[in-house]
Curated annotation (Swiss-Prot):
Species this chain originates from: Francisella tularensis subsp. mediasiatica (strain FSC147)
Residue positions where N6-(pyridoxal phosphate)lysine is found in the record: 32
Listed GO MF terms: alanine racemase activity; pyridoxal phosphate binding
Cofactor annotation: pyridoxal 5'-phosphate
Keyword set includes S-adenosyl-L-methionine: no
Protein name listed in UniProt: Alanine racemase
Family of the protein in this entry: Belongs to the alanine racemase family.
Keywords annotated in UniProt: Isomerase, Pyridoxal phosphate
Active site positions, chain numbering: 32, 257
Gene3D superfamilies: Alanine racemase (3.20.20.10), Lyase, Ornithine Decarboxylase, Chain A, domain 1 (2.40.37.10)
InterPro entries: Ala_racemase, Ala_racemase/Decarboxylase_C, Ala_racemase_C, Ala_racemase_N, PLP-binding_barrel
Record has Transcription as a keyword: no
Gene: alr
Job of this protein: Catalyzes the interconversion of L-alanine and D-alanine. May also act on other amino acids.
Length: 365
């Protein structure tokens, strides 16, 4: 059995640190991609009293949130109109990505005789989603004047927040400042938000009315310097498994597909029942590390869909079947932390955690 153990205390402490850091700004907690792999229902249930909004990528994720919490939920992604009636009935906040969305939403709202809560996404430079910057003001004005829309928010997204010195950060902030000025001229109550986790840590004056700290809430810090208070934020989860078999190699034998790992006579290998079929990175095969009884052991051979092997050497520490194996550590400096694994596989912590799938049990402790 593979378990992602999540510390409720660490999670809540992370959010409290963030809330203190952002001052009076509201907090919108992104729980998209199954709460970055941590389990959307468990995370929402244990944080709903600490945050103002939740945010997700699509309608189906939003319904999972509204099933367990009453907080407002913002959907970042495009509007899937096959789900729009349920979204409106549950007061889920939609993101207007184009001027044309307004008329479509108005028509449906009229038919349902119920207003739609909306946030307008403005493309200030990431060039992925959102209303074109040059069309921003007329779109905001149109939505604000609509009888069937409640324009609750206007937002954008930083493209280079992980690099605090990137000039695009200033360019996007300046553009958003002009949007905020126009928006507040219509109503001071419209929530303006731009910053993700690394945005408000790396840039000044960027919190506006609300921030959206996703990866930071789960305990992952940027690589640039942050102050002492933020350094108290810790990863919330550890991925654990068990040793299910010990194998002793004979002279000339190997292990795994293609037998790329060749051991020595008498070498012992531990079999762990987790693989890339669980969303664990296949690239770690033959070069990753696991922790068994506070000793680091190297992976041996290719990772399979459902299992991997580690070399115990001569097994001087007497690893046994049933011993706990730590695959992902909550200590960033460890060789098997999400940070270290991401570096080793040329990716980011988001990727390592969010790809862990539902074959892995989530457990709040």
């Amino acid at each position: 059995m593979n378990i992602l153990k999540i510390s409720k205390q660490t999670l809540r402490n992370n959010i409290k640190i963030i809330r203190e850091y952002i001052g009076n700004a509201k907090m919108c907690f992104p729980v998209k991609a199954n709460a970055y792999g941590h389990g959307i229902e468990d995370i929402v249930e244990n944080t709903h009293d600490l945050v103002d909004f939740f945010a997700v990528a699509n309608s189906l994720e939003a319904f999972r949130v509204t099933a367990v919490a009453k907080n407002p939920v913002l959907v970042f992604g495009v509007i899937y109109y096959e789900y729009i009636e349920k979204m409106i009935s549950e007061n889920i906040r939609v993101s207007i990505q184009d001027y044309e969305d307004i008329e479509k939403l108005e028509q449906i709202a009229k038919e349902l005789d119920k207003k739609v809560y909306a946030h307008i996404n403005i493309n200030t430079g990431m060039n992925r989603m959102g209303v074109n910057y040059n069309d921003a003001c007329r779109t905001i004005q149109r939505a604000y004047e609509s009888d069937w829309l409640i324009l609750e928010g206007v937002y954008s997204h930083l493209a280079c927040a992980d690099n605090r010195d990137h000039p695009t950060n200033i360019k996007q902030k300046n553009r958003f400042d002009s949007i905020v000025k126009f928006t507040k001229g219509l109503s001071q109550d419209i929530i303006c938000h731009l910053s993700n986790s690394y945005g408000f840590l790396g840039q000044k004056g960027i919190c506006y009315d609300m921030v959206r700290p996703g990866i930071l809430s789960y305990g992952f810090l940027p690589e640039f310097y942050v102050d002492r208070v933020i350094r108290e934020i810790k990863p919330i989860a550890r991925l654990l498994s068990k040793v299910v078999k010990i194998i002793t190699l004979q002279e000339g034998e190997g292990v795994g597909y293609s037998l790329i790992y060749r051991g020595f006579e008498g070498e012992q290998l531990a079999v762990i029942p987790i693989g890339y079929g669980d969303g664990f990175p296949r690239e770690l095969g033959d070069r990753g590390f696991v922790n068994i009884n506070d000793v680091m052991y190297p992976m041996a051979g290719r990772m399979s869909m459902d299992g991997l092997t580690v070399s115990l050497g001569i097994n001087e520490y007497d690893v046994k079947v049933g011993d706990t194996v730590e695959l992902i550590s909550a200590i960033p400096r460890n060789r098997n932390s999400a940070f270290s694994i991401a570096k080793q596989t040329n990716t980011i912590e988001y990727d390592i955690m969010s790809t862990l799938n539902d074959r892995i049990i989530r457990k709040i402790i």
